[in-house]
């Protein structure tokens, strides 16, 4: 190959590499279908219906089931719509996670706790660098078995927000004195499983997940630090005055348990509790 041809080839390779890196910084926007971003990880074969816009997970006497995303993220807004299993579902847990792959992992989690009728409880939990036990539980103001409802995470360099149907119910703000999830990439995961003894007469239990809206910073070709760029709208996102009102009302009206107030479990208030707004 002539020297001039080698130079041209090298330039082409550089351009391709730059384009690939730039694509790594592109946000994933809009509704992401199950076939495009998710795959089953355990349990029964998931049933994809409604032209890839809906996924069913099954729990029976043999096993539950779960899925996770193919893509990993460094920040973003992550939403899924869930219809929990039928009314009589004591012991059944339907979950949606944002989680990292590490022995000292970070994790955000929604868990719809099955019961034999309303009011149903929604447990939220966090793991910060492998340390869990940070439960906050809410009485849902609707029946999650009757229709689909939205469950969302906002994750940016300044705060983590848990949303239910556009109502913020839990906010964790960055605090220089405590650990904040900003060094580990995370992926999405969902499951239905038994948390205790369940009624075999009610099996199978079927949890339905509708196509999610993902607006996140993908990290295939770059480090997580690039995902803090304010060019991404979610990194500039703060609670609006309306959201603050909804948040305070949800905490006042529907909060059922807060680990930060549990002196039997934690005689000393956990350090990160000062980071909740």
From Swiss-Prot:
Post-translational modification: Contains at least one intrachain disulfide bond essential for its enzymatic activity.
UniProt keyword annotations, A-Z: Apoplast, Cell wall, Cell wall biogenesis/degradation, Disulfide bond, Glycoprotein, Glycosidase, Hydrolase, Secreted, Signal, Transferase
PROSITE patterns in UniProt: GH16_2 (PS51762)
Disulfide bonds listed in the record: 217-227, 260-273
Residues at the catalytic site: 107 (nucleophile)
A single GO BP: xyloglucan metabolic process
Sugar attachment sites: 50, 194
Top enzyme class: transferase
Assigned EC number: 2.4.1.207
Transmembrane segments: none
Location of this chain's protein in the cell: Secreted, Cell wall; Secreted, Extracellular space, Apoplast
Known catalytic reactions: breaks a beta-(1->4) bond in the backbone of a xyloglucan and transfers the xyloglucanyl segment on to O-4 of the non-reducing terminal glucose residue of an acceptor, which can be a xyloglucan or an oligosaccharide of xyloglucan
GH16 domain location: 32-209
Cellular component annotations (GO), alphabetically ordered: apoplast
Positions that bind xyloglucan: 123-125, 133-135, 265
Entry GO MF terms: hydrolase activity, hydrolyzing O-glycosyl compounds; polysaccharide binding; xyloglucan:xyloglucosyl transferase activity
Residues annotated as signal peptide: 1-24
PANTHER family in the cross-refs: XYLOGLUCAN ENDOTRANSGLUCOSYLASE/HYDROLASE PROTEIN 8-RELATED
Protein's recorded name: Probable xyloglucan endotransglucosylase/hydrolase protein 11
Source organism of the structure: Arabidopsis thaliana
């Amino acid at each position: 190959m002539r020297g001039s041809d080698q130079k041209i080839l090298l330039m082409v390779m550089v351009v391709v590499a730059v384009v690939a890196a730039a694509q790594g910084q592109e946000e994933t926007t809009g509704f992401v279908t199950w076939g495009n971003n998710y795959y089953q990880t355990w349990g029964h074969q998931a049933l994809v219906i409604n032209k890839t816009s809906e996924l069913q997970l099954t729990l029976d006497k043999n096993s539950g089931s779960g899925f996770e995303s193919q893509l990993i993220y460094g920040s973003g807004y992550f939403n899924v719509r869930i219809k929990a299993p039928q009314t009589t579902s004591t012991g059944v847990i339907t979950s949606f996670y944002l989680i990292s792959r590490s022995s000292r992992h970070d994790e955000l989690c929604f868990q719809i706790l099955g019961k034999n009728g309303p009011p149903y409880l929604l447990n939220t939990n966090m793991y910060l660098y492998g340390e869990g036990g940070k439960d906050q539980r809410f009485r849902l103001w609707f029946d999650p078995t009757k229709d689909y409802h939205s469950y969302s995470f906002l994750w940016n360099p300044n705060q983590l927000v848990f949303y239910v149907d556009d109502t913020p119910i839990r906010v964790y703000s960055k605090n220089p004195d405590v650990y904040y999830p900003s060094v580990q990439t995370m992926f999405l995961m969902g499951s239905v499983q038994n948390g205790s003894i369940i009624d075999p007469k009610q099996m199978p239990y079927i949890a339905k997940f509708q196509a999610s809206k993902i607006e996140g910073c993908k990290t295939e070709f770059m480090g997580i630090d690039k995902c803090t760029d304010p060019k991404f709208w979610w990194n500039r996102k703060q609670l609006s005055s309306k959201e603050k009102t909804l948040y305070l009302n949800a905490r006042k009206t529907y909060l059922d348990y807060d680990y930060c107030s549990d002196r039997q479990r934690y005689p000393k208030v956990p350090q990160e509790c000062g980071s909740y707004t």
